[in-house]
A protein has these predicted regions:
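A solvent-exposed interaction/effector surface
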Residues: 2-161
């Protein structure tokens, strides 16, 4: 996308339903709650490490800042994308059970637009892009960190599978 001064690399990806286990919080928990969740998740990662999906080199395949509306229907955050649930999580085997203190989410399959996070205004620019291209956000946006290179992405669901 090139509009104004921002250029975004947008990739269309189909991802089947998948499972994550992490530390759950909500926007009702106040400022800084996401950083606190990641701190807890990182500190206690060993508790879920045996269930984490890994690539052929033994590297976890992904860490998700998974999001949902309060009903856990995986709809976009409410009140102009400012209120909802967040799970600081790792992708795990579908059969994994969440240890005590952890939460398991099964995220539905979607066609996503994946965007590399290279500036703080990626989210509003993508919402604008969706509107300009007559695309509908059909689920909650998720943050994703690729453990191989530490790159952050945002995943915007545009079609439910």
């Amino acid at each position: 996308m090139e509009k104004g001064r921002l250029i975004m690399q947008i990739e269309k990806i189909t991802k089947q339903a998948f499972t994550v286990v992490g530390r759950q919080g909500s926007t009702k928990d106040g400022d800084g709650f996401i950083a606190r969740l990641w701190g807890e998740a990182n500190e206690h990662f060993g508790e879920i490490a045996p269930f984490v999906k890994k690539d052929e080199n033994g590297t976890p395949i992904g860490f998700w800042g998974a999001m949902s509306d309060f009903s856990l229907s995986f709809r976009p955050w409410e009140n102009v994308f400012s209120e909802g649930l967040y799970l600081a999580s790792a992708e795990v085997e579908d059969t994994a059970e969440a240890p005590e203190g952890w939460t398991k989410w099964q995220i539905p399959g979607y066609v996503y637009l994946r965007v590399k996070v290279e500036s703080p205004d990626v989210f509003p620019k993508m919402i604008e892009y969706l509107a300009e291209n007559e695309l509908e956000l059909v689920g909650a946006v998720h943050d994703f960190t690729d453990p191989k290179d530490g790159q952050n992405y945002m995943w915007f669901p545009i079609e439910k599978l």
